[in-house]
Amino acid sequence: METTVLFGNGINRIGNNGVSWDKLLESISQRKQLHYIPSNTLRYESIIIPMDEITPAVLRDKYGRRLIDSEGQVLCTSENTETFVIKQKIANILDEIEPSYYYQKLADLNANHYVTTNYELSLVQEFKTRKMNVDCIDDKSPLFKHFIIQKDGKKSSIWNIHGDIIHPQSIIIGYADYSNYTTKVHHILETKRRLKKSWVNLILNTNVHILGYGLADDEIDMWDILVYRARMIRHTGKQNNEIIYYLIDKGIRVRSKRMLLERLKVSVVVIPYGGSYESAYQIIYKRISDTMK
């Protein structure tokens, strides 16, 4: 069976240049964060919604003063334009960050497929440095857009499932984006329409290794797929593939997350933190590499 490596922003913790979600929000908002909010998307909304005074999309006069209409409302371009400005700023920040060396190790795995929630194209660039042919199978939706990597008869695919920095408008961020996107994911699951052309098919029908991906409660698109898969296994009595989640043990919700994932028919491998993410990810790499031999 083919193998998929699914990774998130956790691998960018290796090295000095990685940017956390919190730091990214601080960079684009210039506003103090409300750290007690557990949800990533709610933290985003709590900062972005009050940004009318600093968003470039707000219309101003030549003195920098906000323009007000006859009813006292701030004049601005469309909400879509404001959102694009924010996404463009995110893309610019991520584009300036030097990639973690761990992308070299991911490329060394030679997996059939790579799926990432990250916006940057670091893995694509890594394959390009190896003189491999890279073709973009373009689509308006991150559900179907992907890159095909080929060399010497070997082929892999890379999917940035939450959009990418080359097309900032494709970036999935905030509640509206996640809700709309998850609705489309669920439609694919229920109707099977274009299933085989989307990354969703890889989670259901290839062996999947998940690393560097916190699977926060608000990652509702991925949870929807995992719940759907677990229900299908229960109803049919058949399991098409194996999903392995590598959980780094820092003592926070390890037991509860492990139990939940195992109930959803996901195998969990607990990795000791060992004082650094680097040591933990070295162990994960060896585990995946050994499994794929």
Describe each region flagged by the PLM.
Residues 158-165:
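Class I SAM-dependent methyltransferase SAM-binding "motif I" and its flanking Rossmann-like core
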Residues 1-36, 81, 130-135, 145-154, ...:
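SIR2/sirtuin-family catalytic core signature
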Residues 140-146, 173-197:
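Active-site glycine-rich loop that binds ribose-phosphate moieties when present
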Residues 1-107, 115, 123, 216, ...:
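Gly/serine-rich nucleotide phosphate-binding loop at the start of the catalytic core
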